[in-house]
Amino acid sequence: MNATIREILAKFGQLPTPVDTIADEADLYAAGLSSFASVQLMLGIEEAFDIEFPDNLLNRKSFASIKAIEDTVKLILDGKEAA
């Protein structure tokens, strides 16, 4: 999952720093992630994992780091399996 998120981030994140040099816990907004790029990132993640972000998870915290994105995707996938 981490590798897939990193690939999507590299494609849509428009970051000035190479994604492979960014730590899982690093602040993506401090690394240069814009609000526009975060929307593109979200759409890429939704497509890759066949999920839809619920309104309550559409926030800066969900996309703050690679780890945060991974945790959010896992939360959505767990909820999807339970449904």
Curated annotation (Swiss-Prot):
Top-level taxon in the UniProt lineage:
Bacteria
Q: Report the SUPFAM superfamilies cross-referenced here.
A: ACP-like
Q: What residues bear O-(pantetheine 4'-phosphoryl)serine in this entry?
A: S35
Q: Where are the transmembrane segments?
A: none
Carrier domain location = 1-80
Q: What keywords is this UniProt entry annotated with?
A: Phosphopantetheine, Phosphoprotein
The record's function comment reads:
Aminoacyl carrier protein. Can be charged with L-alanine, L-glycine or L-serine, via the formation of a thioester bond between the amino acid and the 4'-phosphopantetheinyl prosthetic group, catalyzed by the Atu2573 ligase.
Protein name, UniProt field: Aminoacyl carrier protein
This chain's source organism reads Agrobacterium fabrum (strain C58 / ATCC 33970) (Agrobacterium tumefaciens (strain C58))
The lineage is: Bacteria, Pseudomonadati, Pseudomonadota, Alphaproteobacteria, Hyphomicrobiales
